[in-house]
Amino acid sequence: MNLVSLQNWLDNASFAVLFLTMLLYWIGAAFPGLPAINALGTAGMAIANLSIATLLGARWIEAGYFPLSNLYESLFFLSWGITTVHLIAENSSRSRLVGVFTTPVAMGIVAFATLTLPSDMQVSEPLVPALKSNWLMMHVSVMMLSYSALMVGSLLAIAFLVITRGNNIQLQGSSVGNGGYRTNGYRLMKAGELVSQPATPPVENNGFARLESQNNGNGNTAVLNLATTPQATTLTPTETLSPQRLSLAETLDNISYRIIGLGFPLLTIGIIAGAVWANEAWGSYWSWDPKETWALITWLVFAAYLHARITRGWQGRRPAILAASGFVVVWICYLGVNLLGKGLHSYGWFF
């Protein structure tokens, strides 16, 4: 089997494996009592990761340069990065729910590259003069890895919003994931429930108070509210989160923060490397090319996210919404500007 045939087989195999893996993760989420299904999902993601890595390696050997010169190659590198970050996030969170959100994205990317792009864009071609530089690997690979990490982190933020149904849940963990009302039989009640509390509750957590009601046979109740709440407050009843759902939400919030914290410095390094390469190739560090502009917008969005988490102490819904918007911004930066068909970075134009 020659390298071209191997690549054709591997790209189709990667799509098939990711499709089956997506189904396994969805079945595992629908029927949590089947741990073998979840284990098979993890194995499928690892197999897909290895298949894509083998495809990229074969293409590297065939073409003689790092396979990031066109849209087809970058899409597969992006899907490889997403599967890699997925495996890291899943191992860190010990939650198979991560795959419910990341696998469809990885599969969609592979499907787009394999089934949508014309065949002439899937063939290795000699590098254009502007890409004949050692900066190709340094700049493009780091940018693609940053996109992968930021996408996965944003997907986990979207998963957090789904788990909490978009409600503003107050988490007791720090920005690096310590603490939280997820043990000792407590459940966290949201604003809107009927609560009865003493006139002067003990103040904790920068103005928030932890209040406990009597045991009613269903476990104690932990209520997080402002310390200035009067002795008895009647609010409109709302649905509470189960301890399991609350614990999962806190885990997703923490893992999302950590993954984005990994992707942001990669994005910073990639932008700096690109500026140096641009000066070497075109005589200017920054030319406000559409790709450069959206890379800066992406950097600002996630810089705001990390600033809100680290400096302002934001957790829960607000940073999750910001990260979810970052998911859209990353896609515009990576693929949207290529659809414009103009600019110094329009190598991926395919219409």
UniProtKB/Swiss-Prot annotation:
Main localisation:
membrane
The GO terms this record gives for MF are: heme binding
One GO BP annotation here?
cytochrome complex assembly
Membrane-related topology note:
Multi-pass membrane protein
Q: Which Pfam families match?
A: Cytochrom_C_asm
Q: Which GO terms describe its cellular component?
A: plasma membrane-derived thylakoid membrane
Instruction: Keywords in alphabetical order, please.
Output: Cytochrome c-type biogenesis, Membrane, Thylakoid, Transmembrane, Transmembrane helix
Question: Any transmembrane segments, and where?
Answer: 17-37, 38-58, 68-88, 97-117, 143-163, 259-279, 286-306, 320-340
Q: Where in the cell is it found?
A: Cellular thylakoid membrane
Q: What does this protein do?
A: Required during biogenesis of c-type cytochromes (cytochrome c6 and cytochrome f) at the step of heme attachment.
Q: Belongs to which family? A: Belongs to the CcmF/CycK/Ccl1/NrfE/CcsA family.
User: Which NCBIfam families does this chain map to?
Assistant: cytochr_II_ccsB (TIGR03144)
Q: How does it assemble?
A: May interact with ccs1.
Protein name as annotated: Cytochrome c biogenesis protein CcsA
Please give the organism. Answer: Trichormus variabilis (strain ATCC 29413 / PCC 7937) (Anabaena variabilis)
Identify the coding gene: ccsA
